[in-house]
């Protein structure tokens, strides 16, 4: 591999980072605490269902 093939990697990824960091007014905004709470409730629900199935 020559060093000339990998010269544009950082420049092309910088555009993607800028694209995904852009705020969109119409996007769904979910608080990270809500995601953690949902995950905990889901895990507890799975444990309860496993306990009832035995």
Curated annotation (Swiss-Prot):
Positions of transmembrane segments: 32-53
Subcellular location: Cell membrane
Membrane side Cytoplasmic: residue ranges: 1-31
Extracellular side stretches: 54
Single GO biological process annotation from the record: protein transport
Membrane topology: Single-pass membrane protein
Record's keyword annotation contains Transmembrane helix: yes
Principal place of residence: membrane
GO cellular component: plasma membrane
InterPro entries the record matches: Preprot_translocase_SecG, SecG/Sec61-beta/Sbh
The protein's assembly and partners: Component of the protein translocase complex. Heterotrimer consisting of alpha (SecY), beta (SecG) and gamma (SecE) subunits. Can form oligomers of the heterotrimer.
Purpose of the protein: Involved in protein export. The function of the beta subunit is unknown, but it may be involved in stabilization of the trimeric complex.
Family statement: Belongs to the SEC61-beta family.
Protein's recorded name: Preprotein translocase subunit SecG
Natural source organism: Haloquadratum walsbyi (strain DSM 16790 / HBSQ001)
């Amino acid at each position: 591999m020559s060093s000339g093939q990998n010269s544009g990697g950082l420049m092309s990824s910088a555009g993607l980072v800028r694209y995904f960091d852009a705020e969109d007014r119409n996007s769904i905004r979910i608080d990270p605490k809500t995601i953690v709470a949902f995950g905990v409730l889901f895990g507890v629900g799975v444990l309860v269902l496993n306990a009832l199935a035995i």
